[in-house]
């Protein structure tokens, strides 16, 4: 009696979780293993698809690209397709980074072909994304000459200097901080080295920099370019380490 009262008092001060036995319950889990009319690949596209505008699935493999065309002696590839299979899991070889590299190579080859076709009577194929801003009128297909005039007029209207933008901000009363000046000098030196070592992307004019990224969120473009630059920096550091070890 006294022992039972002691236990009851102890349970009031320090509550104890009690376990109750239940009868066994049978549970059945049903998956999608029955009555499946689609293939494994088609079901994978519904899970790993990442299309930006809800288009139907399409292949974006680099192996199944649109081929190349020889223009003014330069093999110009087809315009890269936007990837639709990003899994958003931080892959080492991200499809957006690969797309950025393909787009950079495509712009570089297209600009090289536009420079070599100048002064000739050869016409750029109208179905091969002609760079109207880089071509002379005699090299533009007849069907696209009106569009070429519109492109040139828009380019002429754009200011070539930053005077219009600078006028929006008040003039600085004092000099820039030393840290800012040092950072500017460092960025200029890095940009100069990048143009010398990897001039492919820098050869593209700023007016064509956004080509291929029009319908893609800007944060995706920034992510792809950032990852590409970090990877190139890592490769350069590894090459410098190899050179130093070889000299030792």
From Swiss-Prot:
Pfam families: Oxidored-like. Residues 69-116 form the Oxidoreductase-like domain. Residues 1-26 form a transit peptide. Disulfide bonds: none annotated. It comes from the Eukaryota. The keyword Signal does not apply. GO terms for cellular component: mitochondrion. The keyword tRNA processing does not apply. It is found in: Mitochondrion. InterPro entries: Oxidoreductase-like_N (IPR019180), OXLD1 (IPR039251). Keywords: Mitochondrion, Transit peptide. PANTHER family: OXIDOREDUCTASE-LIKE DOMAIN-CONTAINING PROTEIN 1. Belongs to the UPF0651 family. This is UPF0651 protein YPL107W, mitochondrial.
